[in-house]
C-alpha cells in the first residue's frame, strides 16, 4: 500500500511505524485512530484508509496518513461496509506486527462508517454486527457515526480527490 500525509506527499509505511514505535517507547501519550470509507465512481470503488494519530509528541500532535486503492465496485451495501471494516482491522493488525508495541500500548480505536441511528442511515442494521467483528479481533475501542470522524470525514474527503 502506498501512504500519503495530509499535504498529499508520499510517506513510507516504515517511517509511520518507526515514529509510532518511538512515540510509545518514549512514553508519549497517544491515540491511534483508523477509519475507512469508500466511494463508487463508475464501475470502480475508491477505498481510503485513514490512519490518524493524536499525541503529545512534538511535531506529531495531530497528524494523519491515508492510503487509497481502486477496486471493482461493490455489489451491495453490506459488502461495502464489511470490506471497509476489514481494511481498518488489516491496518491495525499491520501496526501490531510492525511496531515494538503491545496491543495495550498501541491504544487503537477503529472508526466505522456506519450509524447506530436507524432513522438516519441504512447502515444502522449492520452496526452491531460490525462492532462485534472489530471487538472479536481484539480491538475494544470502536466508534460509529456521529463519532467516527476518521472514517466519516478524513477518509471520506480523500475518496473524492484524484490522487
Show which residues each predicted segment covers.
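Basic, amphipathic N-terminal segments that precede the first structured/catalytic domain
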Residues: 1-40, 104
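Short glycine-rich or small-residue beta-strand-to-loop segments that form or flank ligand, phosphate
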Residues: 33-36, 109-115
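Acidic, metal-ligating active-site segments
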Residues: 34-35, 39-64
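A short acidic (Asp/Glu
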Residues: 43-47, 119-127, 153-156
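Acidic helix/loop or adjacent segment enriched in Glu/Asp that either coordinates divalent metal
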Residues: 70-106
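Catalytic phosphate/metal-binding cores of nucleic-acid and nucleotide-processing enzymes, i.e., regions
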Residues: 75, 136, 160
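Short, low-complexity, polybasic intrinsically disordered segments
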Residues: 112-147
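C-terminal functional segments of enzyme domains
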Residues: 143-163
